[in-house]
Amino acid sequence: MLRIQGRRLKWNLTQNEKMGGIRNRDPRVTSELRWQPGGSPGVIRWTERFGGTVRKRRNSVILLSSTQASEMLNQFQHGNQSRTSLDLGKTETVVSLQEGYVRLSGEAQVSLDNLRMIAKCEDAIFAVRECRVEKVIRFSNTSLRTYKLRPTADWPALEISSILMHRIKGTTPRRDAEAKLRLVSPVQGAVLDTCMGLGYTAILAAFTADSVMAIEKDENVLEMARLNPHSQPLFQDRKITLIHGDATQIIPDFGNATFDIVNHDPPTLSIAGELYADAFYADLLRILKPGGKLLHYTGAPGSRGRRIDLSASVTRRLARAGFANVHNDSETFCVVAARPGRRR
């Protein structure tokens, strides 16, 4: 059973479907959240009544990176058709060149000049709506940060104010998420992702887990996930339940021994120190089942201007909180720990 705000829920596929997949825990939002005007992919609606949310699919948005733009330009040298992807590699389609414009899908088209511009920009992703080409980037007046999708060799990375939220040096976001999950395999039972981001770990965990709950505090990050084709299982997979809210406020409401695995990939210590606090670690220990595992990403020692070895500090704090078998994995820059007891 899962307890949230005093309500007892049987957390299984049927209840997940009733819940609609997305929960809102931000008290400032009472009826609906509308994304920034001018190119919104849709509206996530929810009500104060628990379980009153409606799962909505995003509107179809064509996304291109330098990879697809370069492919099309090369193929158009030999004819007026090109096979390419309009969703960052998920699927392929045939597009045609007519009178200096590439007809993509429906009313969407892009000029050759814009296609050449996209091909030269290797660190950005572009959305095409009818004849408009826009870089996928958002500025938040609340956090005063910019949010951007950045192309990689497989799944896009999230960049916040020029700081990458994914590892891409010597790896890719997908391979990195797969490597992390191998540290806590077998991935079974109930999984919690405390800081969802683009949701790659939650998506991969859902392949074998019974259920996955993912928490995301930043509505701008959630917007990036809704735009990202490779994040769509978050909104479509009935095994995955999303909560829009603050993990430090939500997790205390969970019952004891609720989860088999907890993935904790918080922002930097300077941004979210509360997610590294002793009290928060104690709550993570409490909600894990005996033998359950914690996967805590810390990053490389000294990275992003750090003067401390964060992984060593986290290792000490987790041991002090009562975790067992606490150790650091140098390949993924994660600390792995377990709640004492036997895993069922």
Please give the residue ranges for each predicted region.
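N-terminal auxiliary segments of SAM/dcSAM-dependent transferases
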Residues: 44-150
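Conserved class I S-adenosyl-L-methionine
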Residues: 187-197
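Conserved SAM-binding loop of SAM-dependent methyltransferases across substrates and taxa
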Residues: 198-209
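Conserved SAM-binding motif I beta-strand of class I
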Residues: 211-216
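S-adenosyl-L-methionine
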Residues: 218-255
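A short glycine-rich, Lys/Arg-flanked "PGG" loop and its adjoining helix->strand segment in the class I
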Residues: 276-290
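Conserved beta-strand signature within the Rossmann-like core of class I S-adenosyl-L-methionine
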Residues: 291-298
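Class I S-adenosyl-L-methionine
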Residues: 302-344
